[in-house]
Each structure stands twice: as structure tokens, then as C-alpha cells.
A protein has these predicted regions:
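The DNA-recognition helices of helix-turn-helix-type DNA-binding domains
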Residues: 25, 39, 50, 65, ...
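Short, basic-rich loop-to-helix N-cap that marks the start of a DNA-contacting helix
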Residues: 50-63
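Short, charged recognition helix plus adjacent turn
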Residues: 63, 73-99
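The alpha-helix within a helix-turn-helix
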Residues: 22, 33, 62
């Protein structure tokens, strides 16, 4: 049975994680875009937190990094849950736990 758990820490957009990884590898956004066959603006929008990582992008990133898509989808899901939790605030706390 699911339990209510407050997510810890700030919401970190997966674009920040991607930017950090690219910096370590010394890979530019345009190099990544070419490598995963997407428009460069998709990559730059993700890097700037203006675009979500979709299943399509997660599959491409997972293939290129050799890590699988799950890490990228999980980062996006975690980010969205933290944002939603912060937005719902007291409304969420007012919902009774069944049981």
C-alpha cells in the first residue's frame, strides 16, 4: 500500500544533470544534438530547463550515454513530482490518507 512521503530536497531539472554530464565530457549541445539526431534547440531548451525530457529524448540519451532511458525519465518524473508537490502544498496535506 502506498504511503505519503514528502520528497526531500529542491526540484532539479534534468537539464542541469545533462549540462553537468556534457561539461565533464566536453561535448557541446550541438554535438549532442547531432549525435542523437534531434534539433539543437531541443537540447538547448532542455539544458535551460524550458523543455521536459520526453520518452523519445530519454531513449536517445540513454542510447548515447549507454545508461538506458530509465535514468532520464526518472529524473524528469522526480522533477515534476517535486514541482507539483510544492504547488499543491496544503491542498495535498488536507487529503486524508485512506485507511
Amino acid at each position: 500500500m502506498p504511503s505519503a512521503v514528502k520528497l526531500a530536497g529542491p526540484a532539479i531539472h534534468p537539464g542541469k544533470v545533462l549540462a553537468d554530464e556534457l561539461a565533464v565530457l566536453n561535448v557541446s549541445p550541438s554535438q549532442l544534438a547531432r549525435a542523437i539526431d534531434v534539433p539543437v534547440n531541443r537540447v538547448t531548451q532542455i539544458l535551460h530547463g524550458r523543455r521536459a525530457i520526453t520518452a523519445d529524448t530519454a531513449l536517445r540519451l540513454g542510447r548515447w550515454f549507454g545508461s538506458g532511458p530509465e535514468i532520464w525519465i526518472d529524473l524528469q518524473t522526480d522533477y515534476e513530482l517535486r514541482i507539483a508537490e510544492a504547488e499543491l502544498g496544503k491542498t495535498l496535506l488536507a487529503i486524508p490518507v485512506r485507511g
